[in-house]
């Protein structure tokens, strides 16, 4: 169990006047417990939950298929198991709420996640419970990482960055996007990642597309190649993107990359505690705008247990940065026929900003032979 996170959650419940909070989404279950129930993210009816009470008791709830995993990872926990296909998911959960003495209580639940039919069944089974939305509570807590989380993200960011470097070093003109995909996934696991998400391999004219996977297209001289992947470790994600050029870059590619490096350095200077997310984006646009290409609506976003989290550094919304935030920052050009992107993982420190994905030197485009 993640004691630091439980303590943060208890303080948040006291401020919100909640008697308990239920972490039911895969990301928030992992936030409380420190581990992912393996099949929950892909078979989302296989409910798992961590119930945290205001007096810091924690009880777990999981489907029978995952009982051995949960019991092995939390052998001392109060764990309730429900049987898949027997229709008893919510009755078992309601019994857990009763046994914790929470009837008549105000309980926070992720109303954005739990299916409406299941929440309605809970309301019928334990009608004297007041169910309150808790998604925003978790979002606010997860924005500020603990020192342990920051170090975890540092490890994962280096794994991901290093895997991309390994992959580019293994290919040359004539290699295919599939070759590059195989190389980066192999390197991720070899370096210690447990999984990956959203693998983007886009070369030549396909580099203009934001989120495409690999094809059998062969790399050609002059191609720009965008390679982005989110390495995963203990439920946390680190998204890194590097752009390579095959053998010889164009003058325009070099011009854009020189601007990206200046944007990178500017962001490293202005990302700091107390800074406004909107002001950061506007300062970024002053430099990026010299290129003459249309920007996307943000240059950065929170990252951690989900691929995109708050805060966003963009034209919508307003956040004040705080130490402990971990962000993905990404100048990107997606133009007609080509694209370039430079994405790093950074953390807001007490003094300013620190890059966590620091394996690759990014002053120049990666060269592929």
Question: Which functions belong to the PLM regions below?
Answer:
Residues 1-369:
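Active-site neighborhoods and metal-handling regions in enzymes and metal-associated proteins
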